[in-house]
Amino acid sequence: MLFKTLSLAAVAALSLATPALAEDVTVTLTGVEARGGVIVASLQTRGEFMQTSAAHADRVERPAAGSVRLTFRGVAPGDYALMAMHDEDADGRMKMNGYMPAEGWAMINGDALRGPPTFDLVKFTVSATGTDISVPMTYPR
């Protein structure tokens, strides 16, 4: 009887340790301006936040004005930050004007930022069934 109870406990523990299935995250960037170049976007975990690489990335060459839709496949449930930039000259770097971006960018809650972003301010949660979000682009004037 003890062996049977331990076996059931082991099966239960293994089933709880199984990672959640990965799903798709669809991001719609609104307010995109036709400025040439490329829109580069990534989903970043807390550990990847504000780094140059992330496990989930996508890009759109020469985006047209309006909305751009990106799909990130195989994203595990959890908290992520969306980082997007409109790299107008496609040099792979965000141009800055002092401390402000000189190219288009987007983050969750980006319009509410009054200083450098933190993961907790710009994160969103990916559910076990996938997630669809819409985020406005911000362009310098």
Regions picked out by a protein language model, each given a short descriptive name:
Residues S7-A17:
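Bacterial N-terminal signal peptides
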Residues T18-A22:
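Sec/Tat signal peptide C-region and signal peptidase I cleavage site
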Residues V25-V32, A41:
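A short, amphipathic beta-strand motif
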Residues V32, R73-V75, S127:
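Hydrophobic loop/turn residues within beta-sheet-rich immunoglobulin-like superfamily modules
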Residues G66, T71, A76-D79:
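A glycine-anchored, Pro-Gly-centered beta-turn/N-cap motif
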Residues Y80-A84:
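A short tyrosine-centered beta-strand micro-motif
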Residues E88-M96:
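Acidic, glycine-anchored loop motifs typical of Ca2+
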Residues G104-P140:
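Extracellular beta-sheet/turn segments enriched in Thr/Pro/Gly and aliphatic residues
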